[in-house]
Amino acid sequence: ETVYYPTLDQYRVSSAIALQAVEDAPVYAAADGQVLSVVQDACTGTTVTMELGNGYQAVYGQLKDLTVAEGDTVKEGEVIGNISAPTKYYSVEGPNLYFAMKKDGVPVDPFEYLE
């Protein structure tokens, strides 16, 4: 889906969603899984990728104060960290949770899996 990014003043294709949030708000795991990676990304800041099983992964970005590390098993609803100040790529949009999902490495629409 093509999305307009006010900070960049341009449209870009994005398979993720940016959920407006309040800085320091807790971020909860959307499903049971295992933390596959924790990386620092210029666009999405501190980013956690969780393996959910059956080829599915969930990606959470714009985080700080993580409560999980690579290899940790996480239960649905468990706090994995807090919302950080936005990276420079989201400065106009403000604090947000970057959330994406993949199936077998291919981006899928997260709205199809969230209740």
Task: Set out the residue ranges of the language-model regions.
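Surface-exposed connector loops and short turns at secondary-structure junctions
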Residues: 25-28, 69, 108
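Conserved, short, structured surface segments that act as functional micro-motifs
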Residues: 72-115
